[in-house]
UniProtKB/Swiss-Prot annotation:
Signal peptide: 1-23
Membrane topology annotation: Lipid-anchor; GPI-anchor
Propeptide residue intervals: 397-419
Ranges for region Disordered: 50-111, 146-237, 312-332
Native organism taxonomy: Eukaryota, Sar, Alveolata, Apicomplexa, Aconoidasida
A family per Pfam: TSP_1
Basic and acidic residues bias: start-end ranges: 65-95
Species assigned in the record: Plasmodium cynomolgi (strain Mulligan/NIH)
Name of the protein described by the UniProt record: Circumsporozoite protein
Ranges for region Required for the binding to heparan sulfate proteoglycans (HSPGs) on the surface of host hepatocytes: 81-89
Domain statement: The N-terminus is involved in the initial binding to heparan sulfate proteoglycans (HSPGs) on the surface of host hepatocytes. The N-terminus masks the TSP type-1 (TSR) domain which maintains the sporozoites in a migratory state, enabling them to complete their journey to the salivary gland in the mosquito vector and then to the host liver. The unmasking of the TSP type-1 (TSR) domain when the sporozoite interacts with the host hepatocyte also protects sporozoites from host antibodies. The TSP type-1 (TSR) domain is required for sporozoite development and invasion. CSP has two conformational states, an adhesive conformation in which the TSP type-1 (TSR) domain is exposed and a nonadhesive conformation in which the TSR is masked by the N-terminus. TSR-exposed conformation occurs during sporozoite development in the oocyst in the mosquito vector and during host hepatocyte invasion. TSR-masked conformation occurs during sporozoite migration through the hemolymph to salivary glands in the mosquito vector and in the host dermis.
Subcellular compartments: Cell membrane; Cytoplasm
Amino acid sequence: MKNFNLLAVSSILLVDLFRTHWGHNVDFSKAINLNGVSFSNVDASSLGAAQVRQSASRGRGLGENPKEEDGADKKKKKDEKQVEPKKPRENKLKQPVENADGNAGGNAGGNAGGNAGGNAGGNADGNAGGNAGGNAGGNAGGNAGGNADGNAGGNADGNAGGNADGNAGGNAGGNAGGNADGNAGGNAGGNAGGNAGGNAGGNAGGNAGGNADGNAGGNAGGNAGGNADGNAGGNAGGNAGGNAGGNAGGTAGGNADGNAGGNAGGNAGGNAGGNAGGNAGGNAGGNAGGNAGGNAGGNAGGNAGGNAGANAGNKKAGDAGAGQGQNNEAANMPNVKLVKEYLDKIRSTISTEWSPCSVTCGKGVRMRKKVSAANKKPEELDVNDLETEVCTMDKCAGIFNVVSNSLRLVILLVLALFN
């Protein structure tokens, strides 16, 4: 084995010697791995030198060629130089239009936006927005909005909104809103809103709202709202709201004299004399004489005389009594379970007569057949065929007394015997 190892190492060294002289690229790692050679007895320095040379040659075998890399870099740089764009000739470039001193964007000197000198927006000198000299918005000299000189909004001289001289809104001289001279809103002279002279709202002279002179709202002279003279709201003379003379509200609202709301004299709301709300004399709310709310005489709420709320107290008492009766009835109903148990005990002897109580002391149950089930056989009977009730036995005290007395006697006898 030792001879074999020496032979393998010497073979590797010889081949490596030939490789360095003849430039052959050979990978000896595979050969070593395949043969499974052990290097335990081989000189370490020899193996180290061989591995260094082997790794260098392996790198060249994998295609690492520094010469080729240099050539590629040079070619890449050359391509980059060819891709660079050529600088354009300066004499072919278009130059931006130079503005005059103090201008922006090619305007004339002191202008903005292509306007003439001192203008804004293409206006004449000193104008804004294409207006004539000293104007704004295409108006004549000193005007605003296309108005005549000194006007606003296309109005005549000194006017606003197309009105006559000194007017506003197309009104006559000194007027507002197309009114006559000194008027507002198309009214006659000194009027407001198309009213006659000195009126407001189309009323006659001194009136408001188309009323007669001194009236308001189309009323007769001195009236309000189309009423007769001195009236309000179409009432007769001195009345309010269409009432008779001297009345208020029919007397108010079409009532008789001194009445309110269509009631009889001195009444309110269509009631009889002195009444309120259509009630009989002295009544309120349509009740009988002296009543309230349609009740009988002296009553309240539709109750009989002296009662309130349909005998609410009695009704409550009746309800309470009914509730007590229901409670008593429930208390007298025996337990269904006890009934079934007792029925099973006395099934063969039960009849239409009451049975003995199910207990001898305290509360129990007793039962009998119903008349309709009198002919039924005992085995066919059920709870629905029986009449039942709770029964109470009072023998408990007597039994207790007998037992206690007996115990006393026993105790006395025992004491006597031992003494």
